[in-house]
Curated annotation (Swiss-Prot):
InterPro entries: Tauto_MSAD (IPR037479), Tautomerase/MIF_sf (IPR014347). Pfam families: Tautomerase_2. Its EC number is 5.3.2.-. The active site is at residue 2. This is Probable tautomerase YolI. Keywords: Isomerase. PANTHER family: TAUTOMERASE YOLI-RELATED. One of its GO terms (molecular function) is isomerase activity. Belongs to the 4-oxalocrotonate tautomerase family. The gene is yolI. It comes from the Bacteria.
């Protein structure tokens, strides 16, 4: 049940944001094999001066269309992560017109004890999930 946070520069319309979220979710479902219904996404829009993402010497040309995806998820294999990165870059460019130069992804891994979906319970630990 990955939790995805999208940080973008403010000013995107609702339709383009929804397409971004839908496209990223489909890539995650395919790369990680999570159920379609497991969808947890947060969008945070920032003024341009609040997102300072330099190219780290890799030659990226960042624009106002920059997207940072921060994911919290249980452990995944390197090949699953590489597949996700490739699918995101390919599909966001094709469907959302977001250049691969404008995509940054970070994954933080956690375990079953690190999730509560409500009611003060750890559903992965108590067998409800």
């Amino acid at each position: 049940m990955p939790l995805l946070r999208f940080d973008v520069i403010e000013g995107r319309d609702e339709k383009s944001l929804q397409l971004l979220l839908d496209t990223a979710h489909q890539a995650m479902v395919e790369a990680f094999g999570v159920p379609e219904r497991d969808r947890y996404q947060i969008v945070h829009q920032h003024p341009a001066n609040e997102l300072i993402i330099q190219d780290a010497g890799l030659g990226f040309q960042r624009t106002k269309d920059m997207v940072i995806i921060s994911m919290t998820s249980k452990a995944r294999t390197e090949s699953q992560k590489e597949k996700l990165y490739a699918l995101l870059a390919e599909r966001l460019e094709k469907k959302c017109e977001i250049s691969p130069d404008d995509l940054m992804v970070s994954i933080t891994e956690n375990g079953d004890a690190d999730w509560s979906f409500g009611l003060g319970e750890a559903q992965f630990l108590n067998g409800k999930l």
